[in-house]
């Protein structure tokens, strides 16, 4: 029995060590975001998305990808100085499928809050509304195209999952799946592969 386990571990480790198909690259782009639950509408908060990724082929048309990047999220009222500024370090675990010249991607996100502030309608920081949850868990869908052999362009939509708001409603009020405020992001990014 022990020999069987050791053989299994050896085969598994040998397979991983012989896998030289990993590809790494850089991500750079723009994020536009809104907050569900702040009584505002529109993706009016503009920010940056910067980081890196590594992917590995599963088969000829499918890849698994792990990415880590900095991203700005939050909300911005165009009629006043009210805004929510959130900065995250985010990891993305996704599966990519290539079909008819397009790359389709779906996956999960895990974000750690780096900095978060709320500003009132006059532009002053409102420290009474700075009680943000440190973790935001979400899901994403994306579509992309290959511009050049080492350059990809992606459009992505992400949203916090219903049970993980980044901020609770005042007084802890809850309405079904609506437990608080949630991030919704539309982003555009370029992904550059370091090697083909």
Located regions from the model:
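Glycine- and aromatic-enriched membrane insertion/assembly motifs of diderm outer-membrane
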Residues: 41-89
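Transmembrane beta-strands of outer-membrane beta-barrel pores
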Residues: 30-34, 68-74, 97-99, 110-114, ...
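Short glycine/proline- and aromatic-enriched beta-strand/turn motifs that initiate or cap beta-hairpins
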Residues: 19-55, 191-196
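Outer-membrane beta-barrel translocator domains and adjoining extracellular loop/strand segments
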Residues: 36-42, 76-82, 116-123, 165-172
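Repeated loop/turn-to-beta-strand initiation elements of outer-membrane beta-barrel proteins
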Residues: 22-23, 60-64, 101-104, 149-153
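Residues that define the transmembrane beta-barrel architecture of outer-membrane proteins
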Residues: 42-48, 85-89, 98-100, 133-139, ...
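Predominantly the C-terminal beta-signal and adjacent terminal strand-loop region
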Residues: 76-77, 139-141, 146-196
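Outer-membrane beta-barrel strand-turn architecture
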Residues: 56-60, 95-101, 147-149, 194-196
């Amino acid at each position: 029995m022990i020999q069987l386990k050791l053989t299994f571990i050896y085969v598994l480790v040998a397979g991983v060590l012989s896998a030289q198909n990993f590809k790494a690259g850089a991500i750079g782009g723009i994020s536009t975001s809104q907050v569900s639950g702040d009584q505002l509408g529109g993706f009016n908060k503009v920010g940056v998305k910067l980081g890196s990724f590594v992917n590995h082929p599963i088969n000829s048309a499918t890849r698994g990808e792990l990415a880590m990047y900095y991203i700005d999220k939050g909300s911005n009222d165009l009629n006043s100085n009210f805004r929510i500024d959130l900065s995250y370090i985010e990891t993305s675990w996704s599966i990519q499928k290539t079909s008819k010249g397009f790359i389709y991607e779906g996956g999960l996100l895990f974000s750690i809050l780096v900095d978060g502030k709320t500003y009132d309608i006059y532009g002053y920081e409102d420290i009474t509304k700075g009680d943000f949850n440190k973790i935001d868990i979400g899901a994403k869908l994306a579509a992309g195209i290959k511009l050049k052999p080492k350059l990809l362009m992606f459009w992505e939509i992400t949203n916090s999952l219903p049970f993980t708001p980044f901020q609770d409603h005042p007084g802890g009020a809850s309405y079904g799946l609506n437990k608080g405020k949630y991030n919704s992001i539309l982003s555009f990014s370029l992904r550059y592969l370091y090697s083909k």
